[in-house]
Amino acid sequence: MSQHKFLFTSESVSEGHPDKMCDQISDAVLDAHLAQDPHAKVACETVTKTGMIMLCGEITSKAVVDYQVLVRNVIKKIGYDDSSKGFDYKTCNVLVALEQQSPEIAAGVHVDKDSDDVGAGDQGIMFGYATDETEEAMPLTLLLSHKLNRKLHELRRSGELEWVRPDSKTQVTIEYASEGGACVPLRVHTVVISTQHSPDISLDDLRKELIEKVIKAVIPANLIDDKTIYHLNPCGSFIIGGPMGDAGLTGRKIIVDTYGGWGAHGGGAFSGKDPTKVDRSAAYAARWVAKSLVKSGLCRRCLVQVSYAIGVAKPLSVMVFSFGTSALNEGELLKIVNDNFDLRPGMIIKDLDLKKPIYEPTAENGHFGHNEFPWEQPRHLQIDVELLKKIGGKTISNGNGIAH
């Protein structure tokens, strides 16, 4: 099999990054409404700068939510509890500019419609991606970037790295081999970590601790060699962080939220949107489809696209692409998708149980690759006899299964 090598890079940002703060606040608002009113229609954007949070958007809900308390609790959880860290939940100003959902949108999307036939909340294109390079069916570049951030802030919370502050970014470059369209990680080429820190640690000590306590704890030793490059706080000191260093806005980390630059992206953000917004629910469903195909052994990589028109329930188009890693052609894979998945928004919401208040955790370390989310549970696929014959009648060894 022909093979060539290439480098690919993905990044992640921490829960204390200003944009991620806004994502978490927007999703906390969504969860607060869904907890009281599962039919709430929410489109909540958050913006932050020094000492200020602003909520803006459209919400139609029976819920009663104390936004002042909610916002401050999210900021406190993240760890911004003193102005020296760039933000303080106790003293920040919380502004609220929320209005009702447009009655024209409501009439076209959900009013007087059966729950199964709810129309798409907007037009748009959404993508799902999966790859067999990791158990999570996620790109290793992004998975490691997320894990580096998560480990860094576990150590911050435990007090083991008490000099770490909430704002950080990570980036991982991996050398891959391409094998017939599949991607095989060979080694970690470069690791970048930039973390906010207290003034009382030297850069030398900071870099040593990042290598010993974060990088070595996260990245498998067999992927690191003497040629691996480290850029640890390469700009020098990073004391001024959070919203004091940069403004934040919901929906500005859509590649971090999804596949780290792999696959494709339709442009729509997730956070702060209830599941009638197909930007969110259809992207989750597309991931569910792609992961189900990969975990069933039908292909090693998979990209799924769906598209919608506002107020129309049925997708305008569905596309499946296997990068040449399947014994089946794209038309045959599409038949399997159509036979096993109903991609109308109402059915996505029902099948994935998306009216529950589950969204704030999605805004922390990526929306995909975490098994606690329902769209990460592969569907047991029903495949007709003729297609089973073409793939040799095999059932997949990982236990997710093909039925006939």
Curated annotation (Swiss-Prot):
Gene Ontology CC annotations of this record: cytosol
Required co-factors: Mg(2+); K(+)
Keyword terms, alphabetized: ATP-binding, Magnesium, Metal-binding, Nucleotide-binding, One-carbon metabolism, Potassium, Transferase
Molecular function via GO: ATP binding; metal ion binding; methionine adenosyltransferase activity
Residues noted as binding L-methionine in the record, renumbered to the chain: E58, Q101, D246, K277
Keyword check for Lipoprotein: no
Keyword Metal-binding: yes
Annotated residues for binding of ATP: H17, D167, S168, K169, C235, G236, S237, F238, D246, R252, K253, A269, K273, K277
InterPro entries: ADOMET_SYNTHASE_CS (IPR022631), S-AdoMet_synt_C (IPR022630), S-AdoMet_synt_central (IPR022629), S-AdoMet_synt_N (IPR022628), S-AdoMet_synthetase (IPR002133), S-AdoMet_synthetase_sfam (IPR022636)
Pfam families: S-AdoMet_synt_C, S-AdoMet_synt_M, S-AdoMet_synt_N
Pathway as given in its UniProt record: Amino-acid biosynthesis; S-adenosyl-L-methionine biosynthesis; S-adenosyl-L-methionine from L-methionine: step 1/1
Cofactor mode of binding and number, as noted: Binds 2 magnesium ions per subunit. The magnesium ions interact primarily with the substrate.
The EC number(s) this enzyme carries: 2.5.1.6
Single Gene Ontology BP annotation: one-carbon metabolic process
Positions of K(+) binding: E45
Record's catalysed reaction(s): L-methionine + ATP + H2O = S-adenosyl-L-methionine + phosphate + diphosphate
Binding annotation for Mg(2+): E11
Role noted for this protein: Catalyzes the formation of S-adenosylmethionine from methionine and ATP. The reaction comprises two steps that are both catalyzed by the same enzyme: formation of S-adenosylmethionine (AdoMet) and triphosphate, and subsequent hydrolysis of the triphosphate.
NCBIfam families: metK
Further details from the record: Protein expression is regulated by post-transcriptional regulation: under rich-diet conditions, mett-10 binds and methylates sams-3 mRNA, directly inhibiting splicing and protein production of S-adenosylmethionine synthase.
Family per similarity comment: Belongs to the AdoMet synthase family.
Protein name per the record: Probable S-adenosylmethionine synthase 3
Annotated organism of origin: Caenorhabditis elegans
Taxon lineage: Eukaryota, Metazoa, Ecdysozoa, Nematoda, Chromadorea
Gene name of this polypeptide: sams-3
